[in-house]
């Protein structure tokens, strides 16, 4: 069963390094490995990536960009208390932005496809793969949150939102300011 590409998700089997702007470095690399190594007998886990476009859709539809700029513009990262307040506010804004219905539906359908392929006991990891991660000038390794042993659609949707919000952990904000 092969799903058609959507603007919300991409299957690892359909990704390559050219997709880095769409799904980030980790996901693009997983896709590249899947395509190159699976035919050679190397077992690479299949799964899907939620695209940067899906993230932007959520923030666009909830008009969150203005709130994020208000929370973060002019922030002095040396003021630890201000950084903590701004980070908490930014995470609240992103986590609170409703997931667009088309994104939610697409993620649910992808989850169901994975369950059909891998079984009812399926558990997955939800990891960041920011499009700015692991660039030649910066490595964002360890700056964002990872969620392991995710089971069930509701838990998956929540983990996706929490992972997206983790783009604004205090350490990630501070790192980006540098």
PLM-predicted stretches and their roles:
Residues 1-178:
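N-terminal beta-alpha lobe that positions the nucleotide/phosphoryl donor
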